[in-house]
């Protein structure tokens, strides 16, 4: 919650070119660090850092459906978190999760092939390896954002600490 409050407004302003309509930052009244289970409803939220440091997934136990949010996207995910090794681990966790159906916020029903392609893309970005343009299939803007943002988030905390209130 404190991270959301601290960085939320800054991120909204920084990413305005990607907004569709107006956005208001509303902080949650319940947070969790590992899992949040609603046993009566057969619903479980699981901390799954990757797309952001505070990403989570939601498992509907009754229907065996895993909602992965923005963690998996076709053809490539937005990389807005500096720990890409953790992101890859989260995607491996999702790939091996025993759900009958996995649903992405932007890509609908997904399969392990897409998850593997997302992992491979993240690994290439992490290691600075060349990426064939066919991998991001017409999503050059997302790819360029990922490469540029990778540098930004790598040094964000250091710059924020040095500049304090002048950072924004």
Feature names for model-found ranges:
Residues 1-49, 53-118:
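Metallo-beta-lactamase
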Residues 3-16, 95-101, 109-168:
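Accessory terminal helices/loops
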Residues 10, 32, 38, 45, ...:
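Phenylalanine-focused residue identity feature
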Residues 19-28, 32, 53, 103-107, ...:
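Short flexible/disordered coil segments
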């Amino acid at each position: 919650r404190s991270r959301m409050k601290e960085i939320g407004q800054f991120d909204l302003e920084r990413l305005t070119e990607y907004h569709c309509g107006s956005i208001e930052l509303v902080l949650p009244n319940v947070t969790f660090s590992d899992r949040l289970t609603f046993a009566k409803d057969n619903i479980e939220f699981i901390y799954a850092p990757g797309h952001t440091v505070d990403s989570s997934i939601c498992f509907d136990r009754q229907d065996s459906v895993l909602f992965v949010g923005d963690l998996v996207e076709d053809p490539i995910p937005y990389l807005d978190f500096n720990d890409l090794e953790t992101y890859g681990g989260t995607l491996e966790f999702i790939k091996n999760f025993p759900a009958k159906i996995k649903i992405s916020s932007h890509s609908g029903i997904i399969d392990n092939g897409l998850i593997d392609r997302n992992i491979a893309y993240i690994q290439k970005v992490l290691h600075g390896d060349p990426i064939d343009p066919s991998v991001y299939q017409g999503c050059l803007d997302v790819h360029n954002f990922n490469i540029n943002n990778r540098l930004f988030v790598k040094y964000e905390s250091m710059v924020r600490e040095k500049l304090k209130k002048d950072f924004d």
